[in-house]
A protein has these predicted regions:
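N-terminal glycine-/charge-rich "phosphate-binding" loop or analogous flexible N-terminal tail
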Residues: 1-50, 179-181
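Phosphate-coordination loops involved in phosphoryl transfer and adenosine-cofactor binding
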Residues: 3, 88, 143-146, 242
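Short, well-ordered coil/turn residues at beta-beta hairpins
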Residues: 9, 54, 72, 220-223, ...
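Short, polar loop motifs at secondary-structure junctions
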Residues: 11-14, 36, 53-58, 74-76, ...
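Phosphate/diphosphate ligand-binding glycine-rich loop within oxidoreductases
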Residues: 47-125, 139-140
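Glycine-rich NAD(P)-binding loop of Rossmann-like domains
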Residues: 121-158, 197
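Conserved beta-strand positions in the Rossmann-like core of class I SAM-dependent methyltransferases
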Residues: 171
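Rossmann-like adenosine-cofactor binding region
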Residues: 177-249
């Protein structure tokens, strides 16, 4: 029976690896944490056909049997200027699976700063409790605030859904002003859930119109030549002085 060698350069539990092995008796699954191709045993590159990795990207000449690279990340900007990208090896991403995790992070940051948690933690570290607590810790609610989500893919949609649950107004920035196409991949538990669509849609040429209306701005754009320096000095100056920028791109 022909086998298929699968290598993971990220650390997964034995339970998860055994679940992968159970897919087919042909799979030979090997794992070693590595951030570069040089950190893996040389003999592995002669065998590997499927690679799961974050940044350990071999030259295809070094891995003659390699057919498929599954990236741990949603973006591939760090792959595009490599021999691997220019080869016939298939490269796929994890776009879509991070939506709940990253959206919760965004809401956590918005809540932390609106509720003055950094100030509270600083006082705690100094073992002090200010007498003017109201002036120091009074917090605006997320409810009725406006959040602008730049990049309305799977993560942006989930940010919008959670923001709506907090009673926020959601502005979405995407390439076209239509209703938008569904993400190429969406977790089954998120698909079709209400509240994901923004209250208003802006295209990139209307960025200067959207930013002044936002109390919070979420930067969820992929890193591409078109988005490089998309948020520049002019964009920052267009924002409210009190606005919070959360960058998860």
């Amino acid at each position: 029976m022909d086998t298929i060698s699968v290598v993971s350069t990220l650390s997964f539990s034995d339970e998860l690896l055994d679940r992968l092995r159970a897919v087919s008796p042909r799979l030979v699954v090997m794992q070693q944490t590595a951030s570069s191709a040089d950190e893996l045993p040389a003999g592995w590159w002669d065998r590997v056909e499927v690679l799961y990795t974050g940044s350990a990207l071999p030259d295809p000449a070094r891995a003659p049997r390699l057919r498929w690279v599954q990236m741990h990340s949603a973006g591939v900007d760090h792959v595009q200027d490599t021999p691997l990208w220019r080869s016939d090896v298939a490269v796929t991403t994890s776009s879509g699976i991070h939506a709940p995790n990253i959206a919760e992070y965004v809401l956590a940051m918005m809540l932390a700063f609106s509720r003055r948690l950094p100030r509270m933690l600083a006082c705690q570290a100094r073992a002090e409790w200010p007498s003017q607590r109201w002036e120091k810790f009074a917090a605006p609610e997320l409810r009725r605030a406006t959040v602008g989500v730049m990049g309305y893919g799977s993560i942006g949609r989930e940010v919008g859904r959670l923001a709506h649950a907090f009673g926020m107004r959601v502005l979405g920035l995407r390439r076209s002003a239509g209703t938008g196409r569904p993400p190429e991949f969406e977790l089954p538990e998120l698909a079709g859930r209400p509240g994901a669509e923004p209250d208003a849609v802006f295209t990139p040429d209307r960025l200067a119109e959207m930013l002044p209306a936002c109390d919070y701005v979420v930067l969820a754009l992929p890193h591409t030549p078109a988005t490089y320096h998309f948020i520049n000095e002019a964009a920052l100056r267009a924002m409210k002085p009190s606005a919070l920028l959360v960058n998860i791109g």
